[in-house]
Structure formats: C-alpha cells, structure tokens
A protein has these predicted regions:
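Hydrophobic membrane-insertion alpha-helices, especially the h-region
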Residues: 7-30
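Active-site-proximal beta-strand/loop segments in catalytic clefts of secreted hydrolases
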Residues: 61-62, 82-84, 115-117, 212-216, ...
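Second-shell loop/turn segments in exported
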Residues: 81-85, 182-188, 210-218, 259-265
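Membrane/wall-proximal cationic-aromatic binding patches
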Residues: 25-85, 89-96
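Secreted/periplasmic serine-hydrolase-like ester/acetyl group-modifying domain
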Residues: 116-118, 122-205, 276
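N-terminal Lys/Arg-rich, disordered targeting/topogenic segments
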Residues: 1-7
Length: 281
C-alpha cells in the first residue's frame, strides 16, 4: 500500500510539474495572445515593437471603430495601422505609439493619427480594463510611463495585481467589479494626460500629430454635442483651447443610424472606404 501511495505521489508531482512547465511556456512564449479575448490588442502590441523596413507616411492608432476602418492586419502602401480597441484607453494608444517610435527611430512616420470615436475620449479605464489594459500594460516595461492619475485609477480596480499572475494573464479571466461613475462630461483625466503626452512625443520627433473622429450614429448627435459643450463650459480639459481639439470637434460627423449594428460600430456593408482621404491635407 505504501509503495502504491509512493508511486501515486510521484506520478502526481510529475504531472503537476509538467502542467506548470507547459503553462509557463504557454505564457512566456506568448502562445495565449491570439487565443484570448481582445487578441487584437496583442496583435497591435507585437506590431508596435516590430522593426519596419521603410518609412510610412502615416501611423494610425485607434479604437475598434478605427479597426473597422483600417484593420491592423491589413497592409497599406503608405499607412501602417496599430488599431485595436477602446478598452486600452488613450494611455494604451500612447504606449503603442511610444513602442513604435523606440523600435523604429530611423523610420518615423510623417504623421501620427489617433483615429478615435468621440465617446472613446470619456474612457478613464472601465470594467473591461482589468483584462484589456492591465494584463498587457501594467508591468515593469510600461511603469515608467504611467502617470500618477493613471496609477491611482489602476489601484481602484479590485485585485489589480492579479492581472500579472501568469495563469490569469494568459486567460480571458476578468475580475467582476464596478467603478465610480464619471465626474467629467467628456474628456477623462487619463485621456487628457495621454493625449498631451502623445502630442508632445510627436512634437519632440518633428512628427505631425492629428486627432480625427470616426463617424457617430445620427441619433447620438445630441448626446455627444451636449457632453462636449458641458466639457467646454466646465473647463474640464486644458486641451480644449488647443487647435488639435478644436479641429477634432469641428470634424465630428454623423451617419444614418441604419449604418450601425450597435451604438458605435458599422455594419460591414456600411464601413466607409478610404475614410481618411477627406482629412488628408
């Protein structure tokens, strides 16, 4: 009986060791990245760290609406796209931009465009952020670029530290939580901070930086314009006085509600083609 138990324990220990080894390889080799929810984030992240062999005219970074307009998986003649989703926030967009600039210092684009739905600018980390933002970005690599306001917001997410545990990070698991409702009308504190950082990074490299809106459902016109006006009245953001934001607001456009399958995303047949041509000046 003791011999049987001894063999059983050895088998269990060996099986556990093999399982842990496989899990470690699965995590550290990044095999999970194209299998979890939000794999588009890891695709954009990997692409942002990849060396290019030519100079692109435009680098596009944006949310899931931008992903519909300019998929990151597609090759373009003079455009490179790092579009993914809004859950990584403007902070995540900045991290992608910074990665690209550090990886390709000799092939910086002429222009960086953040192609962003106006509602995305309200994101100050959300209930999706544990999975979509913390897992890829809350680590030593990006910590030096995390502002105090972003760090404070991260610490409001319950069990935020769990996001870096390998078997959690390599899964689609997300802590179930809620966050305090926003106290701002439109531009969140995180969006404000990281739009400025993005603009300053581009300026330091003599690269143009532009913020361009994707179309909004016509039946949400009053909703977004009221939020913008309230933001202006409340002087919520110091960016509102800059040309970059004033131009962005003036470019906000609307499409028939029938063109959308949800609050922000286009039906496949109604996705605008070559959307940025109208802003190519």
């Amino acid at each position: 009986m003791k011999l049987f138990l001894g063999h059983g324990l050895k088998f269990f220990a060996t099986a556990l060791a093999i399982l842990l080894l496989c899990e470690s390889m699965y995590f550290y080799l990044g095999y999970y990245q194209d299998k979890v929810n939000g794999s588009e984030v890891y695709y954009a992240l990997t692409k942002s760290k990849s060396q290019v062999n030519k100079k692109y005219r435009v680098l596009i970074i944006g949310d899931s609406v931008a992903l519909q307009l300019y998929p990151a998986t597609k090759d373009y003649d003079d455009i490179i796209s790092l579009t993914c989703n809004a859950a990584i926030s403007i902070a995540g967009f900045y991290f992608l931009m910074n990665n690209y600039f550090k990886t390709n210092p000799n092939f910086l684009p002429d222009e960086v465009i953040f192609l962003v739905n106006p509602f995305t600018l309200s994101n100050n980390l959300s209930v999706l952020s544990f999975h979509y933002f913390l897992k890829p970005f809350y680590n030593d690599e990006y910590y030096p670029e995390i502002t105090p306001s972003l760090l404070d917001r991260i610490h409001e997410i319950p069990y935020y530290w769990l996001s870096q545990v390998p078997f959690v990070r390599s899964s689609s698991y997300c802590v179930n939580y809620s966050l305090d409702p926003p106290k701002w009308a439109w531009i969140s504190p995180i969006a404000n901070d990281y739009l400025r950082k993005s603009y300053e990074l581009a300026e330091s490299k003599n690269v143009k930086f532009k913020l361009i809106p994707s179309p909004i459902r016509l039946d949400r016109e009053n909703e977004i314009m009221s939020a913008i006006q309230a933001s202006i009245n409340n002087k919520e953001s110091d960016l509102l006085n800059l040309d970059i934001m004033q131009n962005y607001i003036s470019m906000i456009n609307f499409m028939d509600t029938s063109c959308f399958f949800d609050n922000i995303h286009f039906k496949t047949q109604d996705i605008p083609k070559a959307y940025l041509i109208q802003y190519d000046k």
